[in-house]
Amino acid sequence: MISVTDIRRAFLDNECHTITKAFGYLHEDKAIALIKIGFHPTYLPKVLYNNVVEFVPEKLYLFKPRTVAPLDLISTITKLKNVDKFASHINYHKNSILITGDKSLIVKCMPYMIISDDDIRFIREQFVGTNSIEYILSFINKESIYRMSYQFSENEIVTIINRDHFMYEPIYEHQVLDSDFLKTMLDKYGIVPINSGIIDELYPEAIIEILMAVVRPRDAIRFLDIVNKNQLTEDSVKNYIINDIRRGKIDYYIPYVEDFLEDRTEDLGIYANIFFEDAIDITKLDITKTELEHISKYINYYTTYIDHIVNIILQNNYIDILASIIDYVQDVLTEELCIRIVCESTNPVPVTSLPIHSTLVMVMCIQMKYVDIVEFLDEIDIDTLIEKGADPITEYTFTTRWYNKHNDLITLYIKKYGFCPMMMKRLMFEYPLTKEASDHLLKTMDENRGAIMFFPRTICTLPYLLCCNYKLIQKPIPFKEENRNIVYKKTNRVLCFDLLENSAFKSLIKIDSIPGLKTYNMKDITYEKSNNIICVRFIPQESIHNEERRIKLQLFDIARLASYGLYYIPSRYLSSWTPVVNMIEGREYTNPQKIECLVILDLFSEEFIEYQNLGNAVSNKYELEYTISNYQAAINCLMSTLLIYLVLGSIRSISKTENFVLSILNIFYKGLKINELLSEPVSGVCIELDKIKDRASSGDSSFIFLKKNELSKTLSLCEKVCVETILDNNQSFKSSK
């Protein structure tokens, strides 16, 4: 349980109405300790500024922009890849950043700064060269474009749009563009020429051709706004738009129809009532299912005929359509119809829209995995919800007032997330708890210290272990002395590094000293330094021609290096997958969407990061919003690596999948020096891996996309292995003291 004793004391002693207010009364040391673990309000008092700068500078965004010193800001954001949370601070200190920052820092900050014409002139003077200014300007934001008079070149426009397609909108509003350029952008990028530069090129056929390319209602409306009215009254244009409306593109043409098609209501058919009040008696029409689907989005225009529409829906068993207009048909909904809507409709309906909140309806909602089950609390007690297997604690619940209505819901939340700084921060500092609800929350947490509320199931889960004060302890590396009396051959390898402080060089030195490696064994290594360049010469490990054996031995090396504090970041396979972040934020996670490479590649020293630098390295590599701990980053590395070697290894393996999986796990444990044996079957994992193998072998792609939850059993296995790794590591080092 997160310790809230000091916060509770401050809350009671100072008669605070919010937990945020109580946090401001904490002693600085106590406050900083909580801030370090990510447990803090959405803003901080100025009194904590110096301590935050010294101990957790990445949290400077919690102060008002004017409180943050420019140099402190620049020093902090220079080290971070993801600076989204500093957006207002970056714009506030724009001038200091432009004057002080180098090109890479300015590029990083451009999306957040409101750039003026004077700023562009300054950037041109600072960074001479067309390519430099074009590259920097490609990161400009739309707010800047709306405020400047600077005219972008066609090359600059293309560069900006290549980076962010939707920047065409402010650019096209900003300046008149050549018609040939506009046509090219339409053909190449599908960008509608909503610009006065195209007006002279428009005629009915061209207007229709452009409308055929439109994919956003807003673009259709804005394009028709610039067209000459005489051309909009042409019959060919009217006929095309009427047919487009009948195809379902209703919201593309609402302003146009009201201005130009009042005399064509008969041609609009059932859709006429959307634009003109009760223009058509729809009871005289033969209404198709497609038409019902289209008008259901605009059912408020058909209230006169709602009974007629409902009769057609029920006669034809169109449950999906009934669900889409549920708020307009409350009187006809029985318990049976509510259950059918829940079970048969493609999209979930809001529980608040179900007029009957019976236990049976609730059970159906639970089975269909509804996220707003909490709304049944208006009729059903929380114990019944839990007994039936409901989880009323979801993202949706934060959008309601239920936490202030039910103290039992807060208690349930604490049982689920009381160990998790991120999730408790959301409820305590970001949700508008009443004073009474805040008091109950603090009292419950303070009176249930330790892990008493999390026994027996939660304490052995990976999310719990990631949020608790664990760490991975490494074995000391037995450094060996350099041997200089070596005669080299031409086949020897040479690696050069630009600095002695180079992290890849440091990793290489440590790797060379770790005993027992199978594939990353560099023989007879020597170093030569010259002009700040250091060259490493060594005899490479002999190639292993058996692919399956090479993969297994390579995984052994990765695990063995991890046991000595050198962790492999598999970002060339998984470019954006960080399951640990989801877990510490209390969110569900699924398998990666894509594996970038289907071949297990050779290892390089720069891919291994020392444990003490791992949190920063992983956070920057994946551009996370905040820096995770070294311990959390290590688990992310181990879990990602194990997943990759299971998936890609099984694709390359010629062994029976079950034997391969068990062998991989055994090797992984052996490399980490963990005495564990898997006690559960892996048949479900094998089925998943075999399906991936079949799919990969039937194509010739160098990468593979994964469906959601396609590797759920495999991920569960990886989680369990990580849990065993954490528990074994901490227990082993405790017992060895």
UniProtKB/Swiss-Prot annotation:
The keyword Disulfide bond applies. N-acetylated on initiator methionine by host. Induction: Expressed in the early phase of the viral replicative cycle. Keywords: Acetylation, Disulfide bond, Early protein. Disulfide bonds join C496-C535. InterPro entries: Poxvirus_E2, Poxvirus_E2/O1. The modification N-acetylmethionine is found at M1. It comes from the Viruses. The keyword Acetylation applies. Pfam families: Pox_E2-like (PF04497). Plays a role in intracellular enveloped virus (IEV) transport to the cell surface on microtubules. Together with protein OPG056, forms a complex that interacts with host KLC2 (kinesin light chain isoform 2) to engage the kinesin-1 complex and thereby promote IEV trafficking. Belongs to the orthopoxvirus OPG064 family. Interacts with host KLC2; this interaction promotes IEV trafficking by engaging the host kinesin-1 complex. Interacts with protein OPG056. This is Protein OPG064.
